Amino acid sequence: MECALLLACAFPAAGSGPPRGLAGLGRVAKALQLCCLCCASVAAALASDSSSGASGLNDDYVFVTPVEVDSAGSYISHDILHNGRKKRSAQNARSSLHYRFSAFGQELHLELKPSAILSSHFIVQVLGKDGASETQKPEVQQCFYQGFIRNDSSSSVAVSTCAGLSGLIRTRKNEFLISPLPQLLAQEHNYSSPAGHHPHVLYKRTAEEKIQRYRGYPGSGRNYPGYSPSHIPHASQSRETEYHHRRLQKQHFCGRRKKYAPKPPTEDTYLRFDEYGSSGRPRRSAGKSQKGLNVETLVVADKKMVEKHGKGNVTTYILTVMNMVSGLFKDGTIGSDINVVVVSLILLEQEPGGLLINHHADQSLNSFCQWQSALIGKNGKRHDHAILLTGFDICSWKNEPCDTLGFAPISGMCSKYRSCTINEDTGLGLAFTIAHESGHNFGMIHDGEGNPCRKAEGNIMSPTLTGNNGVFSWSSCSRQYLKKFLSTPQAGCLVDEPKQAGQYKYPDKLPGQIYDADTQCKWQFGAKAKLCSLGFVKDICKSLWCHRVGHRCETKFMPAAEGTVCGLSMWCRQGQCVKFGELGPRPIHGQWSAWSKWSECSRTCGGGVKFQERHCNNPKPQYGGLFCPGSSRIYQLCNINPCNENSLDFRAQQCAEYNSKPFRGWFYQWKPYTKVEEEDRCKLYCKAENFEFFFAMSGKVKDGTPCSPNKNDVCIDGVCELVGCDHELGSKAVSDACGVCKGDNSTCKFYKGLYLNQHKANEYYPVVLIPAGARSIEIQELQVSSSYLAVRSLSQKYYLTGGWSIDWPGEFPFAGTTFEYQRSFNRPERLYAPGPTNETLVFEILMQGKNPGIAWKYALPKVMNGTPPATKRPAYTWSIVQSECSVSCGGGYINVKAICLRDQNTQVNSSFCSAKTKPVTEPKICNAFSCPAYWMPGEWSTCSKACAGGQQSRKIQCVQKKPFQKEEAVLHSLCPVSTPTQVQACNSHACPPQWSLGPWSQCSKTCGRGVRKRELLCKGSAAETLPESQCTSLPRPELQEGCVLGRCPKNSRLQWVASSWSECSATCGLGVRKREMKCSEKGFQGKLITFPERRCRNIKKPNLDLEETCNRRACPAHPVYNMVAGWYSLPWQQCTVTCGGGVQTRSVHCVQQGRPSSSCLLHQKPPVLRACNTNFCPAPEKREDPSCVDFFNWCHLVPQHGVCNHKFYGKQCCKSCTRKI
């Protein structure tokens, strides 16, 4: 007990932290030495060698000697090395193991049971140096255990017994790693153990780097296979600098990306069509599985890691680490039953083709993910997750060592292409890195990054390797991310039981041959990305440049995969673009895929376009192969029924879309402009209404737009395509003169004539009257003339060139058809319309000279047997149409109404249909299901500061709308994991300058009334000193004030003392003399010291006369000549004021021989005025109006902005404005 107490004193209590400084370490060392000395006599009495528990030199690691015990804790043996060598029977494999040892002042009893970390069909494959594959059946399957510590319900243990104990031990308060004691570490501490004992080192994560220094390889022991003492000193020496350099820096799980590297795409990650393909049967939801979820894991160790540990030891080491990972995923804080099962281990003695591994974690992971996606096991069986373990010191953003430990795609689990991680080997702590990176694959984000969990809580998903008192667990945020992932179909691969993968079949093609550069760009930048085709991109074998949006290409500075085509008959090999050569692939000619389904019609009426398309990807042309012959699209007209007469022209609709978009800073109303060259008919030209300019708003109109009015031809992909009268694309079928498609004019009767009459100029003259129903109308002058053709109705309404106003050439719609008016300087005028017209028209000529002759012709349908040809009578029927649902969820309605159709395709007025047959319609209920719950944020609170950065908060509420009800609050768990921001910064602008007051000085008097002062500075928001002129708008605080520290004690030596009399005011005759009463004290030398009168205010003044008459001598009776005249002054009068500066006056007379005289010299006259009481008057006390207060915390800013006169601000900020005044 004495030893245990000493040991407890040597180690700080939980949570107290390590000893600070060298002195602290020294105290611990001394205490430990003392402990060992005290315990020497009782060590033999402890069954499990308790002295080993005190053999460490600090609180991060101790030496222990485990012993095997039975379930009751009774000693069995010190020999714990046989457990991994004996082949166990099935019965033994199911039995439990017990070990016991002392550490950190307590007895630990481990109760262990076999772990299910390995699949029943687990195999090890070795890829040899010549590319050969070797399959091994490991003999270590029965030495991996998991369990707990007796008397600690929250503990967990995951260890390997293959060569001593190696693994993870987690207690309620701490987390330890255990492994056999390295010989060098024992030698350094001059530690030895009795024969047959097998000492181990139990250490915290903080000591991991130090422990690894003393190993030939991580996980090796003192006398175990693979241990080579001759190699250890060299290894220790070579890693000494590395340890000290990396001990503080190597703390990040996922590294930090340099600022110039691009951010990941914001859109959804690109997924190939077979990314989550099932194996033939539908998969259940992982989130609803009643059994545990199995992560069938492939582990790959690279060449550096195999060399580092040795081929004979690396398997045991890796499986020990994976057993620890399994234990971490079984921790109760994860909230789900996750079983990590290793189905296969691949050891790389050299890198296979297409797999590049170096310091650059991002590039290495990209290469590994591509490589492992092509691995296929027995019967096409695939693993769920692939883990790459590397001996490289990796870095997330450069091909040099740095502080990265692992790298992984977010939410990649179960994906064929993204369920993969890279992890740097750091010893047994590697288990935490693997658990962290696999957590990312499960969709987990770092704690504290976009979620409410704190970064430094000691959780597995913290950004850095810092535990909470050494304990790592899963945070509530990680649980939520995992729960969300398991509820998606993507997680379906985890539901099935582990199956035999067998030996993997390695791909016979390089990754770049399987996935071209466009696909690699999609993986990196999203579904819209493709290989950049800009000229500056030179070598994709060094950096793959991709194009996503706009005229900008971007890169993640990762090379294209091995085997990617980089030029004509060239491909990427080892970062170089080289010619195919003899080993290069043979040309593959492209073949078309199957035709797609028909697309939606581009128009709902008036003749739209739909298409089918196919792709030249079955296979794609590669390595100089030919592209597929023929077209990738076929088009067909659709919805050719005419639109309503009142509907807007299709081209006009497209122009109108730009009405709400600013054009060069202004908004216009746009109309179609069609007076363009023939080759520009399929561009969208629009004219600004009421302005004389037009503009090409788009390089091509929408598919199905007519090339020209009243023509069948339509625009498709910016090209005018021929359409026959039979409404077939590419058809040359035309209508005859009477409008019969593919007709021969046999149903037409033609009329024609010539008008040659001459008339007087500047008058309209009729040429021909053409009846309604006419077709193929053509009016043309025979020669060029100065006259003009005109058209009017029978009611004198002019459609063309009326009122002596000449119209420009162009198209003029009237009378049910469109007339094309042609006029040029070298060709005769011409009018043409296909018809039919719906009214009788009068064609005239506005005569301007000689009439050269006007030819006219038109056609009318023939009359059969006295009646025109029978026309089909239109049929009018009711049809039901319905709108879209009014809402997407929460219960809405579909409006249903009946419309009248002519011939089942044209909507007409309802009066054409029979009211008796009109169907009854009523709204339909739709989308009557609850909407997804969402976060409804409240209003932001008032900012906590008026300037210099404050905070404001708001409440959020999880609400949900149920069918036909108002939104109501629901449980927060129903809303998305990510919540809207609840706290935000506000009023970040700098505060205006303010007066800054220093502390008051000491009072100038220790008793009685004194004065104290303080310093005043003008300071800005950053506490910098500014000129006082910038603070003049603010009230200037007082710099001096009176102070009284206490009343002075009475001085018994003070007394009123009368001064000596003054001289008599007259030199002869009657005069006056005065004396003063002064507050005085007689000093030690007998001299009087005068004080202010207030010091004697408590002493009664003696009742003495202070003024009396005097008479030096009598004035002579007769004038005495030759006596000099002098000035005589009377006493000063009382001051006019008591403070602030007043005036005193007195009388001065010139006297000679006792009589007034004028003989005195004026420049000698004494002053008759003088200043008095010049001291400052005390400021009057202001009586503040109790109703004059500030209602807002920003009121002090109102005087600074000079708005106190404003009615609102002056009233609401009365106090601040009063101070300003």
UniProtKB/Swiss-Prot annotation:
- Active-site residues per Swiss-Prot or TrEMBL entry: E437
Which cysteines share a disulfide bond?
A: C369-C420, C395-C402, C414-C493, C453-C477, C521-C546, C532-C553, C541-C572, C566-C577, C601-C638, C605-C643, C616-C628
Entry's cofactor comment: Binds 1 zinc ion per subunit.
Q: What is the effect of changing K455T?
A: In a colorectal cancer sample; somatic mutation
GO cellular component labels: extracellular matrix; extracellular region
- Which residues of this UniProt protein bind Zn(2+)? C254, H436, H440, H446
Q: Where is this region: Disordered?
A: 258-291
User: Which intervals hold domain PLAC?
Assistant: 1184-1221
Q: Which SUPFAM superfamilies match?
A: Metalloproteases ('zincins'), catalytic domain, TSP-1 type 1 repeat
Where in or outside the cell?
A: Secreted, Extracellular space, Extracellular matrix
Short motif Cysteine switch, span: 252-259
Recorded disease is: Microcornea, myopic chorioretinal atrophy, and telecanthus: A ocular syndrome characterized by microcornea and myopic chorioretinal atrophy. Microcornea is defined by a corneal diameter inferior to 10 mm in both meridians in an otherwise normal eye. In addition to ocular findings, some patients have telecanthus and posteriorly rotated ears.
Glycosylated positions are: N151, N190, N313, N745, N838, N909
- Quote the protein name from its UniProt record: A disintegrin and metalloproteinase with thrombospondin motifs 18
Q: What Pfam families does the entry give?
A: ADAMTS_CR_2, ADAMTS_CR_3, ADAMTS_spacer1, Pep_M12B_propep, PLAC, Reprolysin, TSP1_ADAMTS, TSP_1
Cofactors demanded by this protein: Zn(2+)
